[in-house]
């Protein structure tokens, strides 16, 4: 959910810098419009950059893609994609795209199908796997201690030791 991505991003940012200022904006339109407005995404990303943002997490379908594409036209600003490896789905964002927060839907669905077939699926809310896309052109720019921190953080989130404040 958008709220989950938002809370997770803020929790992660504050875990490395408790004094960080995170700017957040949600599309003001109906849900049917919120994910299909790349112009709004681009304009909102530009406003955040003008307010000093140096990283834009562009979540929200085509709206988020518009944000990523805007960030790619700016210098000294980075972006993070969402849902899949947006290096592949939004090539125009490559100049700024550090990584993407990926919803690993295919393995999660395969696991659910397997459990349903074996009779071990109990129903209820199921949270699938998530991951981080490769750093691609930024691979050599990310220091090893930061990469190690990301691996440890993912393990902590998966095990439940680390909480984001959303849904737990």
Give the label of every model feature segment:
Residues 1-168:
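A residue-level marker of the well-folded mature domains of exported/periplasmic proteins
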